[in-house]
Amino acid sequence: MTPIQNAQQIFNRQHKNLPEITVYAPGRVNIIGEHTDYNDGFVMPCAINFGTAVSGTKRDDHIWNVYAADLDETDEFSLNVEIPKSEHKWANYVRGVVKFIQERYPDFQQGANLVISGNVPLSSGLSSSAALEVAVGKFCQQLGDLPLSHTDIALNGQKAENQFVGANCGNMDQLISALGQENHLLMIDCRSLETTPTPVPQDVAVIIVNSNVPHDLVTGEYNTRRQQCEEAAKFFGVKALRDVSVEQFQKREAELTALSPLAAKRARHVVTENQRVLDAVEALKNNDLTCLGKLMEASHDSMRDDFEITVPQIDYLVELAQLVIGKSGGARMTGGGFGGCIVALAPHDKVDSVRKIIADNYEKTTGLKETFYVCTASQGVRVI
């Protein structure tokens, strides 16, 4: 059963009527451009065919009653008083989104009954949180007939995660969940918010392999990386590392390394990764999968050696995938790091071989069982 069907059926069962509003927002996978979004840089994700559905109906008061079907938990809060934090982590994503929409539209106090259901694997680096934020934002827009664009909804979700939940994420996850296009990757300029759709080559599959090493961005390491990047930007006298070219970095690399070796390593990753995203757009335009594969490999090496966010299990998955894919595509870690998933682009006729080499070796070596997904690039948030 899909999240949409599940949310609608459970709502019907709980409330004895059909929901007036159902919205659906997808998770995402980032093909290249990791930890560049909060440095005002470039990213190239696609929305995927896993996501979060929200079904609901107006109430005649100011109360939101929210049921998380997959967790069997309920949260309730009022819109006519200051919205406090919840003891349920998932509920804070919902509350944060509503709180900041209210900040923008103080008259938005419409109560609702909601059911949420999703199939984005939690803590996998595929943005279950952004899908939830964007779905709830779109639900609010429909509920209150608010003049919010999809970009507004995305940035509101990011604000909720930064300022209410407490994770210093960039804006990529929410933007792709809101703006994704079917069968396209979206190159996003995280400063101007301009987007450039790039078709996924027809003969290429988007493969995601979950290492099932759990990770949790809220616990420190992610925020530390962000601080180190800000330290490096300050050294270069710029607003963000986006403003430093590879040549400019190389000229002052030794000087920065002497001051702060870690900040230098983090900056080297971000500066070179931004260039890799721009090069990847050209490679895809030219249908040059060998070049794209080299860029993905360089991205992974940089995350491992300079940004230091991979773990041995992830490195091993990438190594296995690369053995099979060769020069016909690429593989790298995707997401915030410290576990989560790898992404691979490979011809459809290599999917089974990639699946087999991982199934034959990963669990035997690491003691963990992978989860293997073949995804399609999908549309962003929509009303059902």
From Swiss-Prot:
Substrate binds at E34, H35, T36, D37, Y222. ATP binds at S123, S124, G125, L126, S127, S128, S129. Changing D107H: In strain: RM 7004. It is found in: Cytoplasm. GO terms for molecular function: ATP binding; galactokinase activity; magnesium ion binding. The keyword Transmembrane helix does not apply. Pfam families: GalKase_gal_bdg (PF10509), GHMP_kinases_C (PF08544), GHMP_kinases_N (PF00288). Mg(2+) binds at S129, E161. Pathway: Carbohydrate metabolism; galactose metabolism. One of its GO terms (cellular component) is cytosol. It is an enzyme of class 2 (transferase). One of its GO terms (biological process) is galactose metabolic process. It catalyses: alpha-D-galactose + ATP = alpha-D-galactose 1-phosphate + ADP + H(+). HAMAP family: Galactokinase. Catalyzes the transfer of the gamma-phosphate of ATP to D-galactose to form alpha-D-galactose-1-phosphate (Gal-1-P). Belongs to the GHMP kinase family. GalK subfamily. This is Galactokinase. It comes from Haemophilus influenzae (strain ATCC 51907 / DSM 11121 / KW20 / Rd). The gene is galK.
